[in-house]
Amino acid sequence: MSISETTKIAIPEPREISTVPRFSDRVFRVVVSLGGISSLVILGAIAFFLGIRGFDVLSNTGIKFITQYEWYSAINTDGTAGEQASTFGIGAMLIGTIITALIAVAIGVPISVASALFLNFYAPTAVRGFLVSVIDLMAAFPSILFGLWGFNVLMPGGEYWAKLLHKYLSFVPLFDVSAPVFSRSPFIAGVVLAIMTIPIITSVSREVFAQAPLDRIQAAYALGATRWAMIKAVVIPYGRSGVIGGAMLGLGRAMGETVAVFTVLNIVFQVNWHVLLGAGGNVA
């Protein structure tokens, strides 16, 4: 008789591991669940309210409400009906919103990426902490402050830069104007929106760049790379997706801004492709 036949190995039976959540864990789960559900309910209620209130307009105008450029109300100032029929279209406003938002992103993204790289790899520790606090504080500023600052401080300087762009780049249709009116233009509105989006994009980019793999950074230095060469070869490729995400967040705020844009932009219900001219459309 062999040893294997006489020896029996005791195999333990599988056990079920169960945990009983603590009372604080259950309370936390209920609170978080209620918070998430309430957010969805509020968003659904807003969408339902807008749909109900705008159903008459959408049913009368159809897709023309989005594609049409005219906005005319047949109701006179005294409350009587006019001779022409009312026409409502937000096409020009949508195009103007996209133009100002793209100007803001084109100005804000390079400045934000450069600021994030400076904070992570060039700024001294004491200066870094102070600048990070200032940038985070700017992200919490209400939009009315940016609008008033843009109207009272930025607009005179913005007119000067707009005149320079028109003087040297007027051969580009975007920078050509039919009349020398440079105040309250889409360009100035885009600059104000860029200043508003810079803190958001900078914060996101800084956090992404800080997550770059340390072993790759050290390997780049070990191969003799300079700091800028290391940033180009390691940090920027690693954080490209995060920068794009931050730019999308900034674009979302730029497209959804109202008070600041209304303060510095001369709103007209027509498409203006000349960004230096003091007139432009916007959903605001």
Label the predicted regions.
Residues 1-36:
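Transmembrane alpha-helical segments of polytopic membrane transport and secretion proteins
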Residues 29, 111-150:
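Cytoplasmic-entry segments and transmembrane alpha-helices of multi-pass inner-membrane transporters
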Residues 35-52:
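N-terminal signal-anchor transmembrane alpha helix
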Residues 88-118, 247:
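Transmembrane alpha-helix signature in integral membrane proteins
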Residues 141, 201-205, 212, 221, ...:
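Transmembrane alpha-helices
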Residues 254-284:
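Glycine-rich helix-loop "coupling/hinge" segments at transmembrane-helix boundaries
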